[in-house]
Amino acid sequence: MFSANTIHSVFSLFKTDVFSKEVDRFNFGGIFEHLIFNPFEAQIDTGNMMQALLKKAHQNDILILNSQTVTSFQELNNDVEVVTNGITFKTNKLLYTTNGFASQLTNNQVKPARAQVLITKPIPNLDIKGTFHLDKGYFYFRNINDRILFGGGRNLDFEGETTTSHDTTELIQNRLEELLKTVILPHQEFEIEHRWSGTMGVGTHKKPIVEQLSNNVYCGVRMGGMGVAIGSLVGQELADLV
């Protein structure tokens, strides 16, 4: 539940009611009659977002090296020597933005949190439009055109999901399918087309870590599962710090 102070702060920011009680018109199964509606939550096409980011990087003569794993780095006076699985190079400044992969760099202030996901094949006459959260936010689903993207379930196995492995597990994937059948699409047939996972960066605090770690090394990590929403802001703060 939100405290009265939190609700007041949100109202002060948006100058209108952020949450309202709405009747469930989607015919979800096994839930309360009403949903909590937030008109300010939106969808983003992350594919288009990354295309725009790559285009902006190219326009600013920024070189992107793919499939490179940083194995070590060493500060050398005014430079930083970076060693990857493929090459070694020097740079004036090193900025870490690897989020869930930054545990060692931040003395375990950031822990990896795997997020498992699935997406259905196209569903004829799909009526569900929007973004949705359930079970304290541990599950999230949205439509992508006429498909349902559904992810979450980390609370079923916190220890097992504290990993940088990109595997999926039967425990969580089976639960996602079960909720699809019983809650989200109780009256429709569907098929799963893809399953995958990603890595978030979480910690004991929600506030991101934007810090100078040494003379020439900086980090912007611990997005707390909100990387898409706040990543660009954290990037700007990190750039300003340098």
Question: What does each model-identified segment do?
Answer:
Residues S72-L149:
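Flavin-dependent oxidoreductases
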Residues G153-T163:
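Amphipathic alpha-helix from the class-I
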